Amino acid sequence: MAAKPEQDCKTAAALIRAGSLIEGVESAGKDFLVWTTQGPAVKKDPDLLFSLCRVLPGSTQQTLKLQQVEPTADSQELTVQAKEVWQANPGIDPLTYGDIGGLPHTNEPCVLDFLARRYQSKVIYTTAEPLIVAVNPFQDLKNAGPDTIALYRDAPDVDKLPPHVFYASRRAMTNMHQLKKPQTIIVSGESGAGKTETTKMLMKYLATSAGGNLDLKIQTAIMAANPVLEAFGNAKTVRNNNSSRFGRFMLLDVAREGGIQHGKVVAFLLEKSRIVCQDKDERNYHIFYQFLKGAPGHMRQRYMLQPLEAYTFINPHCLDAPGIVDTEDFEQTVKSLESMNMTETETCTIWSIVSGVLLMGNAKPTGKTEAGVENAACFVGESEAALRNACSLLFLDYPSILHELTVKTTYAGSNKIESRWTVPDSEMLRASLAKGMFEQLFLWIIRKLNADIEPKGGSFDVFMGLLDIFGFEVFQNNSLEQLFINITNEVLQRNFTDIVFEKELQLYSKEGISSKKIEYTTNEKLIETLLGKGTSVLAALEDQCISPSGTDEKFVSSLASKLAGNKCFIPSKNTKSLEFTVVHTIGKVIYNADGFAFKNKDVLRPEIIEITRASTNDVVRGLFEGVKVEKGKMAKGMLIGSQFMTQLKGLMEVIQKTESHFIRCIKPNDDKVPLKWVNSKVLIQLHALSILEALHLRQLAFSYRRTFEEFAAQFRFINLGVSNKPGADAKTICVELLKSTSISADEYALGKTMVFLKPQAAKMLVRLQREALSAWEPLVGVFEGMTVLKRAKQLSTGRAVPATRICANVRRKLVQAGIKVC
């Protein structure tokens, strides 16, 4: 389900970065355009976020008087503060710019307006170097056919072609084979943004050989498994009804001439806590609803299925998802399992485990005093029956599982000591068993797929990697899941920042410019705040989860104490509140720690893993294959947070060995209709996908770069005396144009073929150019009048008056420009 419009508006508004004196007002102060959040149109439709206004006389750098001109003209005069104003890019044709970074201003409203106008012209790809931004068109634009593939595959210089996902494919393939280095194309975005379609397009390009042949074997195998992976790994969240709750990394063996020869799928960071609890407006994984709604009578009986409302692990407040027909999807999942060469026994085991995981939630322990332990866990009545049936469905020995859920075993040296688990302890063990069985079943399905598509030995010398992963998440209620997802994105952001500046250094080196002029900051301090040893958010959570008396309240209190004075962390002003704020790369995110400790405790004891390995079922025996067990120890490594960090570390180790390319997918509206653009919806994603951050990183050094010829042509009107100097080459003109301004030498650099400018220098040149052109405005009306006279061929003596005026004005302007006149 899409997020409520008012929620998007509030979230987007909170993310907007304040304007500034520099961006808000120019010293000329003459009738120029700006964006503001205070326009009448925004008051009427908050989704707009910004409206375009004209600055009126009487404005100062602190306070501006405005009049709205877009989306509709309004005579109302506004008085706003500079922090509520952002400069616009008047006169810019968005179709002539392939790279957002080439715009004079790249503030939030300018980027939104630029992308919106391109999108409404059906131009969905844009560069925000080194990113490619892809906006979901919700229609077939016929831009991915054989002709388009051939255009990008065969072009002598692909850099001269418009932005496209095929550009990323071509560049990655070329680098892979020429440099013999693995490549990764990272595709990110929220559900519905077009990640799946983008990945399919990338695979289509990679599978097409230079001779026009299409090798569909591996692509078909992977796509056939996609409904199964989505059923087990996707769920309805408050923002999206088909949200991928895991990261997917595909390794592809691509021939030099094109064609996918082998492949492998690796799953990262499955959101296990969702299996046992969901927020009010969210669902569990799709597979549960497909099975319970779509299974025929004989399956319902065989797998002991009950109504949805009967299961504790199913949120009763959200049983359906708009746009999803669970019964139809169940049929598709069944067909996909068959296409994956599953045996009948394997398929039956899958359904049995799915049912058993759900039923395990109904096995609720109750307390009694036993062996000197108050509230000792035991299972009686319906709970005992549920546990017995769940074990049967999971192919686990019931007496053994019952023992592990009620009897606590510890070791003192070689001595074995038994006592009783309390009810809360038993509930955590039961939940961990359910989560572990489901997660390992999901991974087993992927291993089964890989057995059919990966090369012999399972290793790749050089590969093309496709990473499909979620971006930053900012909800109205942000829990442990959002914290883990946002930590993942911060780590990816650090990698991204390193790559951006590595490319900057390469360009500077090529152009002969000192890299000492690059100044930038990283999110290293933030990552240390989130993940550092001893004093960090994750460390504090792990400490509380290990402690017998640990609670969410103590966790939040510990954070406030340990991170006091840390600029990346803001405690709640209410000491009784479970909320805390982290200052992420994308802005401030408020987390609610209610349930953090419970969600993080994934204490699947070694004894329980050993029970699965003693199962009579072949599939169940192999579920925990490769999982190390060590009896008698309960450590941080068993917690979800630790497992998450292990997987994240593994993902980054793979990515860092490759050369990365980035595609950011944008969902322009929740209605999935063509040409509809919702600013509030898009702005959240621009932050979440680090698109604005990419532009910000470029602003930190010489963000503007043009060839000498392009620079001389763009800013020729600043000083016509220099621009029209006879015999001067482009570089000489550039140097003299810059010297004729007040721009200091440390604000620009001259390379071998290009001019590099810092952001404020580029903005000053734009202003000087506009002032120069504005000074010529009196001549416009005169020339228009002369044109009319000429066309009418009126040869009266009255014509001499406008001619005289023209000559006088032209002579005056030429003298001002330093051009000698007779």
Swiss-Prot record:
Keywords in alphabetical order: Actin-binding, ATP-binding, Cell membrane, Cytoplasm, Membrane, Motor protein, Myosin, Nucleotide-binding
SMART domains hit by this protein: MYSc
Region of interest: Actin-binding: 660-670
Protein location: Cell membrane; Cytoplasm
Protein name: Myosin-D
Function: Myosins are actin-based motor molecules with ATPase activity. Unconventional myosins serve in intracellular movements. Their highly divergent tails are presumed to bind to membranous compartments, which would be moved relative to actin filaments.
Family: Belongs to the TRAFAC class myosin-kinesin ATPase superfamily. Myosin family.
Region spans: Tail: 772-822
UniProt-annotated binding residues for ATP: G189, E190, S191, G192, A193, G194, K195, T196
Annotated source species: Toxoplasma gondii
Free-text domain note: This protein differs from the typical myosin heavy chain structure in having head and tail domains but no discernible neck domain.
GO molecular function: actin filament binding; ATP binding; microfilament motor activity
UniProt cross-references to Pfam families, sorted A to Z: Myosin_head
Membrane topology: Peripheral membrane protein
